[in-house]
Swiss-Prot record:
The keyword Lyase does not apply. Signal peptide: none annotated. GO terms for molecular function: rRNA binding; structural constituent of ribosome. GO terms for biological process: ribosomal small subunit biogenesis; translation. Keywords: Ribonucleoprotein, Ribosomal protein, RNA-binding, rRNA-binding. It holds the Pfam family Ribosomal_S4. Part of the 30S ribosomal subunit. Contacts protein S5. The interaction surface between S4 and S5 is involved in control of translational fidelity. This is Small ribosomal subunit protein uS4. The gene is rpsD.
Length: 206
């Protein structure tokens, strides 16, 4: 098992949920967290615990973002006009690695980050190797021609457990996608419930 895969499953176990909807997730087999104390009976969470968990789950879903990365995105969501929770989701979904994942060019968000880092992705014809690059509406994201026969890509396009959302227009024959619009919370196909409202409450007190 690769370090990336191990980290992904550790996040699932820590959250006690299959947050990416993957059939091989360990929480499909057991309902307790990682480590020797994971099997202890779960206690009712405090409000703070629920808020922290909501933040950790959202951070984990987008590739286990660091607190510094996530806090910076949250601060921007708070600054711009509109609902902070909706803004937060929109900014996360506009990350280049998130769009590559949504387009089903790769099997996992962790693979998307590595794929972008290694220079396999073009945005409007220019190579971009920064996973956090902010995609705009109308941007065309494509896999470099030399990279299109990679096994991970061919596997990802056939994954049955997730579909391409309607705010990403993907053509798997050309390995090209257009970012149609910035989504809101209700548009994003999360396999589990995400609660940005609790994230707002967390940062309001910390």
């Amino acid at each position: 098992m690769t370090k990336r895969t191990s980290a992904k499953y550790k996040i699932d176990r820590r959250m006690g949920e299959n947050i990416w909807g993957r059939p091989k997730s360990p929480v499909n087999r057991r309902e307790y967290g990682p480590g020797q104390h994971g099997q202890r009976r779960k206690q009712k969470m405090s409000d703070f615990g629920l808020q922290l968990r909501a933040k950790q789950k959202l951070k984990g879903y987008y590739g286990d973002l660091t607190e510094k990365q996530f806090r910076r995105i949250y601060a921007e969501a708070e600054r711009v006009k509109g609902d902070t929770g909706e803004n937060l989701i929109g900014l996360l979904e506009r990350r280049l690695d998130a769009v590559v994942y949504r387009a089903k060019f790769v099997p996992t968000v962790f693979a998307a980050r590595q794929f972008v880092n290694h220079g396999h992705v073009l945005v409007n014809g220019e190579r971009v190797n920064i996973p956090s690059y902010r995609v705009k509406e109308g941007d065309v994201i494509e896999v470099r021609e030399k990279s299109r026969q990679m096994a991970a890509l061919l596997e990802a396009t056939q994954l049955p457990e997730r579909d391409v959302p309607d705010y990403v227009d993907a053509d798997h024959n050309k390995m090209k996608a257009t970012f149609v619009r910035t989504p809101g919370l209700a548009d994003v196909p999360y396999p589990v419930m995400m609660e940005p409202n609790l994230v707002i409450e967390y940062y309001a007190q910390n």
